[in-house]
Amino acid sequence: MKFSSKIEKCGLSPMRKFAPYANEAAKKGKKLYHLNIGQPDIATPAAYFEAVKNFSQPVLAYAPSDGVPEMIDAVVNYYGKIDAPITNKQVLITTGGSEALQIALSCILDEGDEIIIPEPFYPNYSTFVTLTGATIRPITTTPEENYKFAIRERVEACINEHTRAILFTNPGNPTGTILTEEELRLM
């Protein structure tokens, strides 16, 4: 099968490239510290299993294309409770954070656009941005500076006529850097 030129540009995630080596080391009895793919460590609520056990609808239909109303209402209510009101039209439910981010980036980035991202960053950001035709303009950080990137001069030096967005997480992934309130306001 011939793959698209866009997907050929993406390459493998570094985590996926190194996984076979880690697996081989584990087989040899080596002690590994997994700092790669995050797995949930919070117990699944019992109510979930109870609901699945008691589910008896004979046909599993597709969800409404605009989302399950009860789920959307729950999101709207949650944000209302934390004093960040939103409307149902502002909610899009996805199966995961990566999917949500890929959709959002596809909506705002075009060929030739740039997105500013502090590095090191979550490796899949490269794939998501490459698929849009945009490029990443990194803000380089160092361990000596605790991976701080929210420095006005550094951020402004990256902004140009092609900049469409700045992408960061708080805490940072993979560095764990936590922005102060002042740094968040700057960003």
Model-derived regions, located:
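N-terminal small-domain helix-loop-helix segment of the aminotransferase-like
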Residues: 6-96, 103, 154
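Aromatic/hydrophobic pocket-lining residues that form π-stacking "cages" and hydrophobic walls in ligand
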Residues: 18-22, 125, 186-187
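Short glycine-rich anion-binding loops that position phosphate/pyrophosphate groups of nucleotides
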Residues: 40, 98, 170-174
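Conserved PLP-anchoring active-site segment centered on the Schiff-base-forming lysine
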Residues: 90, 107-129
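Structural signature of beta-strand start/N-cap positions in the alpha/beta core
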Residues: 114, 135, 164-165
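Short beta->alpha connector loops at strand-helix junctions that form conserved
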Residues: 119, 138-143
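A short helix-loop-beta submotif of the ANL/AMP-binding
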Residues: 131-137
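Active-site phosphate-binding strand-loop segment of PLP-dependent enzymes
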Residues: 141-187
